[in-house]
Regions:
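Glycine-rich, compositionally biased intrinsically disordered regions
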Residues: 2-179, 183-196, 201-247, 251-255, ...
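Secretory pathway export signals and precursors
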Residues: 178, 264-266
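Mature cores of small secreted peptide/protein domains
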Residues: 187, 273-275
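Extended, basic/helix-rich recognition subdomains
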Residues: 243, 257-262, 273
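Sequence contexts marking disulfide-bonded cysteines in secreted/extracellular proteins
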Residues: 267-271
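Active-site "substrate specificity/gating" loop of NAD(P)-dependent dehydrogenases
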Residues: 279
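Catalytic zinc-binding patch centered on the HExxH motif and its immediate surroundings
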Residues: 282-285
Length: 324
């Protein structure tokens, strides 16, 4: 018999197990199959649906009897992250706001100076995985507990964090790991939002804009300089195009703009980027005096919302809103 050594293969999103009679199934095979299926689901969510709150997850800070009771609440709900991870929050989650601010008082003072000062916080929902259902593993005697027992399941889970928004400077050295800074919207998200604004400035009818001009205008959606300057929200009168040019605009978006955006945010389903695993639920604005927070307001206007295909279909079949 020929001797061989079984080596662990690198997980590949494009491969699934091809079982043949007699094939020995080991850890590598099960991991590869799971990786393939999970990556396909996540890619489907990312590329065809997007990300955001699907339902629920409302953020509130109700009035409290004492400062210690002041809490941030997140209601049950469902969301999809920019990485395509699905997050289900089954029950209301709460966090003591003044306790969190007190634990991070030194770090906040490093960022903003001595209190009092205004603080803006992001409420972020993260996808997490937890190993669970520990079972005994057969093997040699005289092993430690770590070697005898192993988790047999991986449970989908989540984590809710408060992150600092609008810090005046980059985080200095020594900033605690527990204190997270909000990340600005990705270029892809900004371009997608601008894509919707762009079509609000388009009137389909008799035409008037050349194909080249329309192509160049749509291509600007991949230009961060144009987006920083407020384009296309600062467009003046409506652009006149023909019905045939609608397809040209969509084709330019799919064939040229999206590949440029893809190059800035590679489509990696299992990378280490935490921003791909989190979704914004809302922002809190407050005044911190070093002991208690006051004037707390909740702003959910920046929260991305993800409509179901059915809801979008019903909305569009009714003609959608009339823009003025």
């Amino acid at each position: 018999m020929t001797d061989f050594v079984r080596t662990a293969s690198r997980l590949d999103v494009g491969k699934r197990v091809n079982y043949s009679f007699g094939l020995v199934l080991g850890v590598d095979e099960f991991r590869q199959e799971q990786y393939h299926v999970l990556a396909k689901f996540q890619r489907h969510n990312r590329q065809l649906h997007g990300f955001g709150t699907v339902w629920g997850l409302k953020v509130s800070v109700p009035a409290a009897a004492t400062p210690a009771d002041l809490e941030v609440r997140v209601e049950p709900g469902f969301a999809i992250t920019p990485g395509g991870h699905e997050i289900c929050v089954p029950a209301r989650m709460c966090a003591k706001l003044n306790a969190w601010l007190g634990r991070n008082a030194d770090a906040l003072a490093t960022l903003f100076g001595a209190p009092p000062f205004p603080v803006s916080l992001c409420v972020l929902l993260y996808y997490r995985e937890n190993e669970t259902d520990t079972v005994p593993i057969p093997g040699e005697p005289c092993r430690s507990d770590d070697e005898v027992l192993a988790p047999s399941r991986i449970a989908d889970s989540f984590e809710i964090k408060l992150a600092v928004d609008g810090a005046p400077t980059s985080p200095p050295m020594g900033l605690p790991d527990a204190l997270v800074l909000c990340q600005p919207p990705s270029l892809t998200r900004r371009a997608e939002e601008a894509f919707g604004v762009f079509w609000q400035h388009v009137k389909v009818g008799g035409g008037g804009m050349s194909d080249q001009d329309l192509h160049d205008q749509v291509l600007r959606l991949a230009d961060p300089t144009s987006l920083d300057a407020g384009w296309p929200g600062n467009l003046g009168s409506a652009m006149q195009i023909t019905p045939a040019q609608v397809e040209l605009g969509l084709r330019t978006w799919a064939l040229e703009v999206l590949p440029l955006l893809q190059a800035t945010t590679p489509d990696c389903p299992c990378g280490p980027d935490e921003s791909a695993r989190s979704v914004l639920l809302g922002r809190l604005d407050l005044q911190w005096d070093g002991t208690v927070a006051s004037g707390v307001t909740v702003d959910e206007s920046g929260r991305p919302i993800l409509l179901s295909t059915r809801a979008a279909q019903e909305w569009l079949s009714g003609g959608g809103p009339t823009w003025t």
